[in-house]
Protein backbone atom coordinates (compact mmCIF):
# COMPACT_ATOMS: atom_id res chain seq x y z
CA UNK A 1 0.00 0.00 0.00
CA UNK A 2 1.32 3.41 -0.95
CA UNK A 3 1.91 5.99 1.74
CA UNK A 4 0.31 9.39 1.25
CA UNK A 5 2.81 12.18 1.86
CA UNK A 6 1.87 15.86 2.05
CA UNK A 7 4.12 18.43 0.39
CA UNK A 8 4.24 22.12 1.19
CA UNK A 9 6.21 24.07 -1.39
CA UNK A 10 7.16 27.75 -0.94
CA UNK A 11 8.45 29.35 -4.12
CA UNK A 12 9.83 32.69 -3.02
CA UNK A 13 11.66 35.52 -4.72
CA UNK A 14 15.08 33.99 -4.01
CA UNK A 15 14.56 30.44 -2.73
CA UNK A 16 12.43 27.33 -2.95
CA UNK A 17 11.52 25.68 0.34
CA UNK A 18 9.90 22.27 0.57
CA UNK A 19 8.54 20.29 3.51
CA UNK A 20 7.20 16.74 3.35
CA UNK A 21 4.87 15.48 6.07
CA UNK A 22 3.95 11.91 6.91
CA UNK A 23 1.22 11.48 9.51
CA UNK A 24 1.73 15.11 10.55
CA UNK A 25 5.48 14.74 11.13
CA UNK A 26 8.21 16.41 9.04
CA UNK A 27 10.18 13.67 7.28
CA UNK A 28 12.01 15.85 4.76
CA UNK A 29 12.76 19.52 4.23
CA UNK A 30 14.99 21.46 1.87
CA UNK A 31 15.96 25.09 1.27
CA UNK A 32 17.41 25.85 -2.16
CA UNK A 33 18.38 29.15 -3.77
CA UNK A 34 16.97 29.34 -7.28
CA UNK A 35 19.18 32.19 -8.54
CA UNK A 36 16.26 33.49 -10.67
CA UNK A 37 15.93 30.10 -12.40
CA UNK A 38 12.73 29.08 -10.66
CA UNK A 39 11.47 26.52 -13.16
CA UNK A 40 14.67 24.46 -13.45
CA UNK A 41 15.33 24.62 -9.71
CA UNK A 42 11.77 23.51 -9.00
CA UNK A 43 12.16 20.59 -11.42
CA UNK A 44 15.44 19.58 -9.74
CA UNK A 45 13.90 19.76 -6.26
CA UNK A 46 10.86 17.71 -7.29
CA UNK A 47 12.94 15.14 -9.21
CA UNK A 48 15.14 14.55 -6.16
CA UNK A 49 12.01 14.19 -4.03
CA UNK A 50 10.54 11.60 -6.40
CA UNK A 51 13.82 9.64 -6.28
CA UNK A 52 13.75 9.73 -2.48
CA UNK A 53 10.10 8.60 -2.26
CA UNK A 54 9.47 6.66 -5.50
CA UNK A 55 6.61 4.49 -4.22
CA UNK A 56 4.57 7.11 -2.40
CA UNK A 57 1.57 9.21 -3.35
CA UNK A 58 1.65 12.96 -2.75
CA UNK A 59 -0.70 15.81 -2.05
CA UNK A 60 0.78 19.22 -2.69
CA UNK A 61 0.03 22.87 -1.99
CA UNK A 62 2.01 25.90 -3.10
CA UNK A 63 2.70 29.25 -1.50
CA UNK A 64 5.09 32.13 -2.03
CA UNK A 65 5.51 35.05 -4.37
CA UNK A 66 6.60 32.83 -7.27
CA UNK A 67 3.98 30.12 -6.84
CA UNK A 68 0.70 31.62 -8.04
CA UNK A 69 1.30 31.25 -11.79
CA UNK A 70 2.76 27.76 -11.33
CA UNK A 71 -0.24 26.70 -9.25
CA UNK A 72 -2.59 27.88 -12.01
CA UNK A 73 -0.65 26.12 -14.78
CA UNK A 74 -0.38 22.85 -12.83
CA UNK A 75 -3.81 23.18 -11.21
CA UNK A 76 -2.31 22.75 -7.75
CA UNK A 77 -3.83 24.54 -4.73
CA UNK A 78 -2.26 27.90 -3.87
CA UNK A 79 -2.35 29.23 -0.32
CA UNK A 80 -1.44 32.86 0.29
CA UNK A 81 1.81 32.89 2.29
CA UNK A 82 0.54 34.77 5.35
CA UNK A 83 -2.35 32.29 5.61
CA UNK A 84 0.07 29.36 5.21
CA UNK A 85 2.35 30.76 7.93
CA UNK A 86 -0.58 31.52 10.24
CA UNK A 87 -2.04 28.03 9.83
CA UNK A 88 1.29 26.31 10.50
CA UNK A 89 2.10 28.45 13.54
CA UNK A 90 -1.36 27.97 15.07
CA UNK A 91 -1.02 24.21 14.67
CA UNK A 92 2.65 23.72 15.59
CA UNK A 93 3.34 26.56 18.06
CA UNK A 94 -0.07 27.65 19.38
CA UNK A 95 1.34 29.88 22.14
CA UNK A 96 3.02 32.19 19.61
CA UNK A 97 2.28 35.90 19.98
CA UNK A 98 4.20 37.30 17.00
CA UNK A 99 5.86 35.90 13.87
CA UNK A 100 8.51 37.87 11.99
CA UNK A 101 9.14 36.50 8.52
CA UNK A 102 12.06 37.79 6.46
CA UNK A 103 11.56 36.94 2.82
CA UNK A 104 13.95 37.54 -0.03
CA UNK A 105 12.40 40.90 -0.88
CA UNK A 106 9.93 41.62 1.90
CA UNK A 107 9.43 41.41 5.63
CA UNK A 108 6.18 40.52 7.33
CA UNK A 109 4.99 40.62 10.92
CA UNK A 110 1.96 38.61 12.01
CA UNK A 111 0.40 39.37 15.39
CA UNK A 112 -1.65 36.60 17.00
CA UNK A 113 -4.22 38.09 19.34
CA UNK A 114 -8.00 37.99 19.38
CA UNK A 115 -7.75 38.85 15.70
CA UNK A 116 -4.88 38.11 13.35
CA UNK A 117 -3.11 41.28 12.28
CA UNK A 118 -0.47 41.35 9.59
CA UNK A 119 1.91 44.09 8.51
CA UNK A 120 4.39 44.21 5.69
CA UNK A 121 7.25 46.51 4.80
CA UNK A 122 6.75 49.00 1.99
CA UNK A 123 8.81 49.34 -1.14
CA UNK A 124 12.21 49.14 0.58
CA UNK A 125 13.97 45.77 0.79
CA UNK A 126 16.17 46.83 3.73
CA UNK A 127 16.27 44.09 6.36
CA UNK A 128 15.10 41.38 3.98
CA UNK A 129 16.90 38.27 2.80
CA UNK A 130 18.23 39.98 -0.33
CA UNK A 131 19.69 42.76 1.82
CA UNK A 132 21.29 40.22 4.17
CA UNK A 133 22.78 38.42 1.14
CA UNK A 134 24.25 41.72 -0.10
CA UNK A 135 25.77 42.47 3.29
CA UNK A 136 27.21 38.96 3.52
CA UNK A 137 28.83 39.39 0.10
CA UNK A 138 30.22 42.77 1.13
CA UNK A 139 31.75 41.11 4.20
CA UNK A 140 33.08 38.13 2.21
CA UNK A 141 30.90 35.56 3.96
CA UNK A 142 27.45 34.01 3.68
CA UNK A 143 24.37 34.57 5.83
CA UNK A 144 25.48 31.88 8.31
CA UNK A 145 28.81 33.67 8.50
CA UNK A 146 26.99 36.86 9.49
CA UNK A 147 25.73 35.00 12.57
CA UNK A 148 29.26 33.93 13.46
CA UNK A 149 30.67 37.44 12.92
CA UNK A 150 27.96 38.91 15.16
CA UNK A 151 28.98 36.60 18.02
CA UNK A 152 32.50 38.04 18.13
CA UNK A 153 31.78 41.74 17.58
CA UNK A 154 33.70 44.25 19.66
CA UNK A 155 32.33 47.53 18.30
CA UNK A 156 28.87 48.66 17.27
CA UNK A 157 29.11 51.07 14.35
CA UNK A 158 26.42 53.61 13.46
CA UNK A 159 24.64 52.31 10.36
CA UNK A 160 21.41 53.56 8.78
CA UNK A 161 18.59 51.41 10.10
CA UNK A 162 15.76 52.51 7.83
CA UNK A 163 17.16 51.96 4.36
CA UNK A 164 19.23 49.14 2.87
CA UNK A 165 20.92 51.45 0.37
CA UNK A 166 21.96 53.87 3.12
CA UNK A 167 23.12 50.99 5.30
CA UNK A 168 25.36 49.71 2.51
CA UNK A 169 26.79 53.19 1.91
CA UNK A 170 27.54 53.37 5.65
CA UNK A 171 29.20 49.94 5.76
CA UNK A 172 31.48 50.25 2.71
CA UNK A 173 33.46 53.28 4.01
CA UNK A 174 33.82 51.63 7.42
CA UNK A 175 35.39 48.59 5.75
CA UNK A 176 37.60 50.82 3.59
CA UNK A 177 38.81 52.55 6.76
CA UNK A 178 39.75 49.20 8.31
CA UNK A 179 36.77 48.54 10.57
CA UNK A 180 36.82 45.01 11.95
CA UNK A 181 34.09 42.78 10.56
Residue positions per predicted region:
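Glycine-rich phosphate-binding loop plus the immediately following alpha-helix
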Residues: 114-155, 163
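Short glycine-aspartate micro-motif
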Residues: 4-10, 59-61, 95-100
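Short beta-strand-loop/turn "lid" adjacent to the catalytic site in phosphate-handling enzymes
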Residues: 22, 31-34, 52-83, 110-119
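A short acidic Gly-Thr/Ser loop motif
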Residues: 10-14, 65, 102-106, 128
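Adenine-nucleotide phosphate-binding core of ATP-dependent small-molecule kinases
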Residues: 167-181
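Short glycine-rich, Thr/Ser-proximal phosphate-binding strand/loop in the N-terminal lobe
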Residues: 3-40, 44-47, 122
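Active-site cofactor/substrate anionic-group-binding motifs, chiefly glycine-
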Residues: 81-100
Amino acid sequence: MKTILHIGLDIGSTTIKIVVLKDGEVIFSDYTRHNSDTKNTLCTVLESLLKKYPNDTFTIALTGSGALDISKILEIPFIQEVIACKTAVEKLIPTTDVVIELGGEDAKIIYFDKFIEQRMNGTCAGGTGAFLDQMATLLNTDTNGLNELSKTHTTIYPIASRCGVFAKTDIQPLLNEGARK
